[in-house]
Amino acid sequence: MAGQKIRIRLKSYDHEVIDQSAKKIVETVTNAGATVVGPVPLPTEKNVFCVIRSPHKYKDSREHFEMRTHKRLIDIVDPTPKAVDSLMHIDLPADVNIEIKL
């Protein structure tokens, strides 16, 4: 797979879980003999939701909730077949969204 690059993009609501997952991916790929660039932290996406506390009136009383999406980017330069195989068999937590592009 000479000249190729695999780009892995991780998303999660918990920054500790996404950092552990990125560390696990980097360790398995480097043990398989490929070179890794990253993990690169991407900007955190912050969604704020404004909700009226009362169901009927008192519009001035509101509550704000926020949801943060943490993102990391990992590039694997010149992946070996062993590295690709180890990537396919890695176990990661369910709350981490993974996008892999070749």
Swiss-Prot record:
UniProt keyword annotation of Nucleotidyltransferase present: no
Pfam families (UniProt xref): Ribosomal_S10
Keywords carried by this UniProt record: Ribonucleoprotein, Ribosomal protein
UniProt superkingdom: Bacteria
Oligomer and partners: Part of the 30S ribosomal subunit.
Protein family according to the UniProt entry: Belongs to the universal ribosomal protein uS10 family.
Protein name, entry field: Small ribosomal subunit protein uS10
The organism of origin for this protein: Bifidobacterium longum (strain NCC 2705)
The organism's taxonomic lineage, starting at the top: Bacteria, Bacillati, Actinomycetota, Actinomycetes, Bifidobacteriales
